[in-house]
A protein has these predicted regions:
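Bacterial N-terminal signal peptides
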Residues: 4-15
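Transition segment at domain starts
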Residues: 37-85, 175-190
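Exposed aromatic-hydrophobic patches
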Residues: 90-93, 98, 124, 130-140
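Short coil-to-beta strand junction motifs in C2/discoidin
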Residues: 102-109
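Short acidic/polar inter-strand loop motif in beta-rich domains
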Residues: 151-160
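Amphipathic, heptad-repeat alpha-helical segments
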Residues: 195-257, 299-306
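Amphipathic, non-membrane alpha-helical rod segments
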Residues: 239-279, 283
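Long, amphipathic alpha-helical segments that form or neighbor coiled-coils/leucine zippers used
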Residues: 269-306
Length: 306
């Protein structure tokens, strides 16, 4: 028996009740170097993104992804199925340009499930291939959520940035009855987003063959992106004050990053580089979150590093 699928309108303009995205609270680690580049300011207005109640034991259903203001030509689709309380998502996208076209800080795309209450869950990194296509199979225990894709400084962020690239869109054949209700919350903060036009232009010229840069293999490219994400994560953690509030965790992240750097120098295509870099990224994000929580909830033993 088919469960009813309800649509809850998620208005895209209020802060989520989670730790802020690193880009929302700290300056870009490379901002000084990029300050001379022309910036294009984009005002993102409120809009509605549907959240679907997939329920329990529903039949597989399909949803589409539509490109948002930053990349309107991007598109995708997903098959969503609930099994024993776990919702499985098999998604694919096309016309998904590299996140680096938005600036040096954007190194990853992340798929998010966002509940009507505003809680966001990172469902995994999306890695476009040379043909601007990507796939991701993932799952969540959330039952009612919207799906969005954002550009991020690294894969392990715990709060979406404002750079929403894609958002889910209902299809005519979506399983179940659709009901739209008024939401009393908003999904993402309204804000002004700076696009680095020089980065966009350089990226697009490189894809069109107008820019002559060093070409590397796919494996080496993955190693480099992993290292850059880890460096970003460490810098954001340091800027948040992790050296004082989460010194041990931050040092662990730095040690992992150093091992990844040395492994890359010895063997750029080694899978170990990506493994170490991703562990460094996650550990650095842990240090940043520990720092934010300790700063917001002072305690007598707060000065002691984790």
């Amino acid at each position: 028996m088919r469960n009813t699928a309800f649509i809850l309108a998620c208005s895209a303009t209020v802060l989520l009740a989670q730790e802020p995205n690193p880009l929302a609270q700290t300056p870009s680690p490379v901002a000084a170097a990029a300050s001379a580049n022309p910036l294009y300011r984009v005002d993102v207005v409120a809009r509605t993104t549907p959240a679907v109640n997939y329920g329990h034991r529903t039949l597989p259903t399909r949803i589409d992804f539509a490109g948002a203001v930053f990349q309107p030509d991007a598109q995708g689709e997903a098959v969503v199925e609930s099994k024993r309380g776990v919702v499985h998502i098999d998604a694919k996208w096309k016309n998904l340009a590299s996140p680096q076209r938005y600036g040096a800080n954007y190194l990853a795309y992340v798929l998010w499930a966002v509940t009507p209450e505003g809680r966001a869950q990172n469902l995994g990194e999306i890695s476009p291939d040379s043909g601007q296509k990507a796939k991701l199979e993932t799952s969540t225990q959330l039952q009612t959520f919207a799906l969005i894709v954002t550009a991020e400084p690294y894969y392990s962020v715990t709060q979406p940035s404002n750079v929403v690239v894609l958002e889910n869109k209902l299809r005519p054949d979506t399983v179940g009855r659709v009901q739209t209700v008024d939401a009393k919350y908003e999904l993402l903060p309204r804000g002004r987003h700076s696009l680095d036009l020089e980065a966009v232009r350089a990226h697009d010229e490189q894809r069109s063959g107008k820019h002559s840069g060093k070409r590397v293999s796919r494996k080496e490219y993955e190693s480099l992106v992993g290292l850059y994400q880890a460096r970003n994560a460490v810098q954001f953690a340091e800027h948040a004050g992790a050296a004082e509030h989460a010194a041990t965790t931050l040092q662990k992240a730095k040690t992992l990053l150093d091992r990844a750097e040395r492994q890359y120098a010895a063997s750029p295509k080694s899978a170990t580089v990506v493994t170490l870099a991703r562990e460094a990224t996650q550990t650095a994000e842990d240090a940043r979150l520990i720092t934010l929580r300790r700063r917001s909830s002072p305690a007598p033993d707060q000065a002691a590093a984790l």
